[in-house]
Amino acid sequence: ICYPINCLQIYFIKLAYMDVSSILIVLPLLIIFSYLFDIFARRTKFPSVILLVLTGIIARFITSLYGYDNFAFLDNLVPVLGTIGLILIVLEAAIELEIKKEKTEIIIKGFLAALIILVINIVLVSLFFNQVIGLPYPTSVIYAIPLSIISSAVAIPSATGLITKNKEFVVYESTFSDILGIMFFYYCIRQAEKGEALIGIEPIITLIGQIFLIIIISIAITYLLFQLIQRIEHHVKFFLILALLILAYEIGKDFLKLPSLVLIFIFGIFLSNFTNLIPKGLKKYIKTDKVGKSDLHEFHLLTAESTFLVRTFFFLFFGFSIPIESFIEFEPYIIGATVLLIMYGIRYFYLVLVLNDEDSKPLLYFSPRGLITILLFLSISDYDIQKSNIVDEKVLLVI
């Protein structure tokens, strides 16, 4: 693998001086390497995203040696790619989920695991940040939340080699962890910016109200988009649906301050399970005859291909944004190792005490941090709250 990677680095060096020909060589090479990394990951169970990040880090190091150090463009590019990637990953995961009566048990198990492990992680990691490192409250909680979220962007692709039961558990748990983690994060951010306590009757009632509101809005938007799919006669229609979903997500998140990822999740689940989810009494009022298996397969394929493309460039550019000097300091390794010990300790005891199943042992290792952790952690600097100079991007990189 090393020789072609070195060839790829040479093209990265010319990044600042690229003409059209160079760009058309580099971009396909990046996609090809990501595809090869995916194949390697499936055979070795080694996450492909780590290989993508390492490739980006090496590329940055080599370009720096040749005197190119203008990486400011990554500050805006990485969050944009990450947000689109998050939407696509949750959408793809939701489309793959089957909602049937016989799936109820695994859905409940996945939700409870996501909720309980996430909450305990946040509590213990924030206590470590507060009592040992000295981060004030609520800054310690806000920094703990992104680090406590299981990344569906990494967990779902890595679970392909598991037995069906465990694979479904990973999909449900990681997706619910993403959604719950994002809701908790923005809730705590709003409370911290207002200078109010994180736990209280009024703010919790407000949060519950927001959840019900976004569910109602999501159902309404899902119905409209579902009807739109059936009415579009143009041969290109699913990219329009994706564009509308991204628009609705961003409006809900930035302007209405709602957990908009719920919208993406509900739409994906409904689209792939509408025959089971529409009540019998409403089926005669809701048209479904123009949405066939071929349409669903086409949309799923489009989502999967788009996810692969965006994920490739997100993790490559994230790695490219990391200076090699981040690996020199020793303190981030201590903090990161302690956080990981807490997280995997909690996960181990949960699996032993709650699931207590021989087949569930591999699930211990399916608790990665990735895209959503990176996005939320880096976004902390955008808010009017007290920041930390100790728990920074270096600690994030280690974890």
Predicted regions and their residues:
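Transmembrane helical cores of multi-pass secondary ion antiporters/exchangers
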Residues: 12-399
